[in-house]
């Protein structure tokens, strides 16, 4: 996929892993995740709704962090839970497990998933593997590895499915920032309107921006462009998760960007449980991934926005995601733009 990215320094895998696991060694990220009530409550409910499949069974928690999901599984009746966590937060997980008197049922393993050896196959895999735009951090790769090596035939994966969505959006904040430069003369007597183009290039750049998007900013119904079945998806398929989209605008506005989000689904006997990061639902710590066009495009009621979108690993750091969008808005010609996680996240600390 060399056509997708500008060539930069490629990090070796050990450096990628060090950066990734080191980022989970501080309390801040765990506070953010556990304080996300949508995330944590949905996982708790998803686990308890599958208690019949968990009770008396063996569970593998991939990327266990503080061990909260392992504890939910133990509370749901699991006989044994292997909580695998490679970062130093595993030391805190051991303390939390002990504090909750679950040492006899939860074993915290401080190691990468790919290097562990378990005494037995597992009945259930649970993992909170999702990153920004679903695939950032590529933790799903470890879940697939665990599935292929450790999960019994017919075993359960929680969550079991993921879906990706896209929609065009308006951004009044960006609009205001661009308009600002035309107001400077009226305020200070100095014309700085020539800064508008420079500001546009700086703001509407090639970064994947993680921001909350309000319902009012979304200009069409969401369009699902990809679905991942965790029981069958392969590592090869994750090298390029792609799909097409076709949206119809609600009314007159300006498209500044595309917005990408995801859902994951927990199976249940009656009604499946969905964890959604949609702008139409309560905000989560994942927010939404915003992909800015080079220039805003004016649209009217029923203007069609069509195209293809592809998510793939960065050539410089395989744990980081890149996104390419090829799109046509109304009668305009086809445009293409590639996006990546900002450079500061690629640097070794």
From Swiss-Prot:
InterPro entries referenced in this protein's UniProt entry, alphabetically: Arg_MeTrfase (IPR025799), PRMT_dom (IPR055135), SAM-dependent_MTases_sf (IPR029063)
Lyase keyword on record: no
Entry GO MF terms: histone binding; histone H2AR3 methyltransferase activity; histone H3R2 methyltransferase activity; histone H4R3 methyltransferase activity; histone methyltransferase activity; protein-arginine N-methyltransferase activity; protein-arginine omega-N asymmetric methyltransferase activity; protein-arginine omega-N monomethyltransferase activity
Keyword tRNA-binding annotated: no
Enzyme Commission numbers on file: 2.1.1.319
GO biological process, one term: chromatin remodeling
CDD domains per record: AdoMet_MTases
Catalytic reaction list: L-arginyl-[protein] + 2 S-adenosyl-L-methionine = N(omega),N(omega)-dimethyl-L-arginyl-[protein] + 2 S-adenosyl-L-homocysteine + 2 H(+)
Signal peptide: none
Purpose: Arginine methyltransferase that can catalyze the formation of both omega-N monomethylarginine (MMA) and asymmetrical dimethylarginine (aDMA), with a strong preference for the formation of aDMA. Preferentially methylates arginyl residues present in a glycine and arginine-rich domain and displays preference for monomethylated substrates. Specifically mediates the asymmetric dimethylation of histone H3 'Arg-2' to form H3R2me2a. H3R2me2a represents a specific tag for epigenetic transcriptional repression and is mutually exclusive with methylation on histone H3 'Lys-4' (H3K4me2 and H3K4me3).
Family: Belongs to the class I-like SAM-binding methyltransferase superfamily. Protein arginine N-methyltransferase family. PRMT6 subfamily.
Name this polypeptide is given: Protein arginine N-methyltransferase 6
Organism per entry: Danio rerio (Zebrafish)
């Amino acid at each position: 996929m060399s056509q997708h990215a500008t060539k930069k320094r490629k990090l070796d895998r050990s450096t990628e892993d060090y950066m990734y696991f080191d980022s989970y060694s501080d309390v801040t990220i765990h506070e953010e995740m556990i304080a996300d009530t949508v995330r944590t409550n949905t996982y708790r409910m998803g686990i308890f709704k599958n208690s019949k499949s968990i009770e008396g069974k063996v569970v593998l928690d991939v990327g266990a962090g503080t061990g909260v999901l392992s504890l939910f599984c133990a509370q749901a009746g699991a006989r044994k839970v292997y909580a695998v966590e490679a970062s130093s937060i595993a030391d805190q997980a051991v303390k939390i497990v002990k504090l909750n008197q679950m040492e006899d049922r939860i074993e915290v393993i401080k190691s990468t998933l790919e290097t562990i050896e378990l005494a037995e196959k597992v009945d259930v895999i649970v993992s909170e593997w999702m990153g920004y735009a679903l695939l950032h951090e590529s933790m799903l790769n470890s879940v697939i590895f665990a599935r292929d090596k450790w999960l019994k035939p017919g075993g359960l994966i929680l969550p079991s499915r993921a879906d990706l969505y896209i929609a065009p959006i308006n951004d009044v904040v960006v609009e205001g920032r661009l308009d600002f430069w035309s107001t400077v003369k009226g305020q200070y007597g100095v014309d700085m309107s020539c800064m508008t183009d420079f500001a546009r290039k700086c703001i509407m750049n090639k970064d994947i921006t993680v921001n909350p998007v309000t319902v009012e900013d979304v200009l069409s119904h969401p369009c699902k462009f990809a679905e991942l079945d965790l029981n069958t998806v392969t590592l090869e398929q994750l090298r390029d998760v792609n799909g097409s989209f076709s949206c119809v605008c609600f009314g007159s506005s300006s498209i500044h960007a595309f917005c990408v989000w995801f859902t994951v689904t927990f199976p249940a006997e009656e009604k499946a449980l969905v964890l959604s990061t949609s702008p139409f639902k309560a905000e989560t710590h994942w927010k939404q991934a915003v992909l800015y066009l080079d220039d805003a495009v004016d649209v009217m009621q029923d203007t069609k926005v069509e195209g293809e979108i592809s998510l793939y690993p960065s050539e410089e750091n395989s744990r980081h995601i890149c996104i390419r969008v090829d799109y046509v808005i109304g009668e305009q010609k086809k445009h293409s733009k590639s996006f990546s996680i900002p450079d500061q996240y690629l640097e070794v600390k």
